[in-house]
From Swiss-Prot:
Positions with a binding annotation for S-adenosyl-L-methionine: H287, D325, L326, D353, G354, N386
InterPro entries, per database record: MeTrfase_TRM5/TYW2, SAM-dependent_MTases_sf, TRM5-TYW2-like_MTfase, TRM5/TYW2-like_N, tRNA_Gua_MeTrfase_euk
Catalytic activity from the UniProt record: guanosine(37) in tRNA + S-adenosyl-L-methionine = N(1)-methylguanosine(37) in tRNA + S-adenosyl-L-homocysteine + H(+)
Gene that produces this protein: TRMT5
Matches recorded under Pfam families: TRM5-TYW2_MTfase, TYW2_N_2
Compartments where found: Mitochondrion matrix; Nucleus; Cytoplasm
Assembly description: Monomer.
Cellular component GO terms held in the UniProt record: cytoplasm; mitochondrial matrix; nucleus
Keywords on record: Cytoplasm, Methyltransferase, Mitochondrion, Nucleus, S-adenosyl-L-methionine, Transferase, tRNA processing
Protein's recorded name: tRNA (guanine(37)-N(1))-methyltransferase
């Protein structure tokens, strides 16, 4: 009996079969234990003691801290500030399925769930012990034993006469096989936030690194380039957008210093020098939202137009567009992009301060749009003010803007004004600040849309309202029913977020 016990051992670990050929008798020995596994909630593993062929165990794979490190880079890379790709070599043991090469294509369509998916790793390789065989790499977090296969998968295996027995394989990993987040999490100090996301502007990755990440900035930049096809330059913003022209000073972390770029947004093409103008790819949805509010024939005044993400789509929609930007570079690229998108005949472009634009070209056009001769006008007038840090201050330009002018229109202009807020109730905060500047409550006139979360406790919002006649036509008696138009359809208010 003792000699028999020496040939067996019990373990709580899951059985894994090495990459070796297994005798048929060995497989038969294991089958009676299948029901016992379920009852005991443990796996009695039998070791067949044979000099040529043997069973061995593989650590049970669970979702715990140790297992989550299976595909983590070696611990030696912690604290690395200059990227050394050779330091990321590592060998891990993963489950594999042995199959005949002629069934691989049919089988892989049914094993998408179970197959390993890692950057740069082939899911099927040649069996080193059998030139006619293949090894299918399996996901070690999903595939433990034969029972890990789903019913449909087992059915396919049976149809193709494939033994569902799982073997193990030593897989060599290199830098190319790790994801950017895994690399940075392994390099940066434990417990620190990891930067794996960025704003993509053509070939440029725009990062906004925090203080604790700065010692690793060049490594982070290179990783972003390595792991994102098409990215050839990584830059970091090194000051806030608070200057006159809304662009920011940036540092090239890695890659080429060429900041001339081309982007596609909502089927339109924009070209510009990213180091000299403002562009935020995270506003793509907002650009589209405003465009959808416009109808052919409407008039759009874009007070802070940038390189044209509001103006050009509006012109393509057959709106009359007046676009302005104070930055000479933005003005230059706005003209260029209008030609590039073939709307240069539909957009009037200005290079003025926002307030001068409102009190000059906008006022002159409104006098025509809202004058007595425009009684039959059916289209709407929209004014977009996308300068979140300061746009609300420019609302004062509407006060008495048309004072002394005849009030002959029914549809007053609709303003879309953007702002940031750190208030606990950001929508109410924006409404109150806008009302303070205008000197009139906007509660009955406005709706507030949450554009995006900029940072913890900081929101970007858009307040939309039809300018009250009492603001535009100061000290004049007006018929509110005729001049203020229908109430705006409410979008998202402070109650919605």
């Amino acid at each position: 009996m003792r000699s028999l016990l020496k040939q067996f051992a019990f373990s709580r670990r899951l059985l894994k079969v090495e990459s070796c050929r297994i005798t048929e008798s060995a497989s038969l020995i294991l089958l009676p234990w299948a029901s016992l596994i379920q009852k005991l909630n443990r796996v009695p593993v039998i070791f067949l003691l044979d000099q040529r062929k043997r069973f061995s165990t593989m650590p049970e794979i669970e979702t715990n801290h140790r297992d989550s490190e299976l595909f983590s880079p070696p611990s030696e890379v912690r604290g690395m500030t200059e990227l050394d790709r050779t330091a990321f070599k590592k060998t891990v043991t993963i489950p594999v399925l042995k199959v005949r090469k002629e069934v691989v294509n049919k089988l892989m369509r049914s094993l998408k769930r179970a197959a390993l998916q890692r950057p740069g790793i082939k899911r099927v390789i040649e069996d080193p012990e059998d030139g006619e065989g293949r090894l299918i790499m399996l996901d070690p977090y999903k595939m433990f034993t034969v029972d890990s296969f789903e019913k449909e998968e087992l059915s396919i295996l049976k149809q193709l006469n494939v033994n569902p027995q799982i073997s193990k394989y030593n897989l060599d990993l290199t830098y190319e096989n790790f994801k950017s987040e895994e690399i940075l999490r392994a390099v940066l100090p434990e417990g620190q936030d990891v930067t794996s996301g960025f704003s993509r502007v053509g070939h440029i990755a725009h990062l906004n690194l925090r203080d604790h990440q700065l010692p690793y900035k060049h490594l982070i930049g290179q990783v972003m380039i390595d792991k994102n096809p098409g990215i050839t330059s990584a830059v970091n913003k090194i000051n806030n957008i608070d200057n006159t022209y809304r662009n920011f000073e940036m540092e090239v972390l890695s890659g080429e210093e060429n900041m001339m770029t081309k982007v596609r947004e909502n089927n339109y093409t924009y070209e510009f020098d990213f180091s000299k103008v403002y562009w935020n790819p995270r506003l793509s949805t907002e650009h589209s939202r405003i465009t959808e509010l416009l109808k052919p024939g409407d008039v759009l005044f874009d007070v802070f137009a940038g390189v044209g993400p509001f103006a050009i789509p509006a012109a393509k929609k057959k709106c009359t567009v007046f676009a302005n930007d104070l930055n000479p570079e933005s003005h230059k690229w706005l003209l260029h992009n209008c030609k590039l998108n073939k709307v240069d005949q539909k957009v009037k472009v200005f290079n003025l301060d926002g307030r001068d634009f409102l009190q000059g070209p906008v006022r002159e056009e409104l006098m025509q749009q809202l004058g007595p001769l425009s009684k039959e006008r059916k289209h709407s007038v929209h004014i977009v003010m996308n300068l979140p840090a300061k746009a609300i201050e420019f609302l004062s330009a509407f006060k008495a803007l048309l004072e002394g002018q005849p009030c002959g229109s029914e549809l007053l202009p609709i303003v879309h004004c953007y702002s940031f807020s750190k208030d606990a109730n950001p929508a109410k905060d924006v409404q109150q600040r806008a009302a303070t500047v205008l000197g009139i409550s906007l509660e009955a006139y406005s709706s507030v849309h949450l554009v995006r979360n900029v940072a913890p406790n900081k929101e970007m919002l858009c307040i939309t309202f039809r300018i009250p006649a009492a603001i535009l036509y100061k000290n004049q008696t007006v018929n509110r029913d005729n001049h203020e138009g229908p109430p705006l359809k409410r979008q998202r208010t402070d109650k919605d977020f």
